[in-house]
């Protein structure tokens, strides 16, 4: 529980704390951005 309070990065949208390597993926939950797109059907995936 204490580790949750000492995480160094906070989401600029909702303020939740995250480790640096998880923050970018979390921000995608707010923006709807998907990093990968299928070349065959153009469907986006995380």
Curated annotation (Swiss-Prot):
Stretches annotated zinc finger (C2H2-type): 1-4, 9-30, 36-46
Cellular component, GO annotation: nucleus
GO MF, one example: zinc ion binding
Main location: nucleus
Matches recorded under InterPro entries: Snail/Krueppel_Znf, Znf_C2H2_sf, Znf_C2H2_type
A matching Pfam family: zf-C2HC_2
Signal as UniProt keyword: no
UniProt keywords, alphabetically: DNA-binding, Metal-binding, Nucleus, Repeat, Zinc, Zinc-finger
Subcellular location: Nucleus
Family: Belongs to the snail C2H2-type zinc-finger protein family.
Name of the protein in question: Escargot/snail protein homolog
Species name: Lithobius forficatus (Centipede)
Lineage: Eukaryota, Metazoa, Ecdysozoa, Arthropoda, Myriapoda
């Amino acid at each position: 529980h204490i580790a949750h309070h000492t995480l160094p990065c906070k989401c600029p949208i909702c303020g939740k704390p995250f480790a640096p390597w998880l923050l970018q993926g979390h921000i995608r939950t707010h923006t709807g951005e998907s990093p990968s797109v299928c070349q065959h059907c153009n469907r986006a995936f995380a």
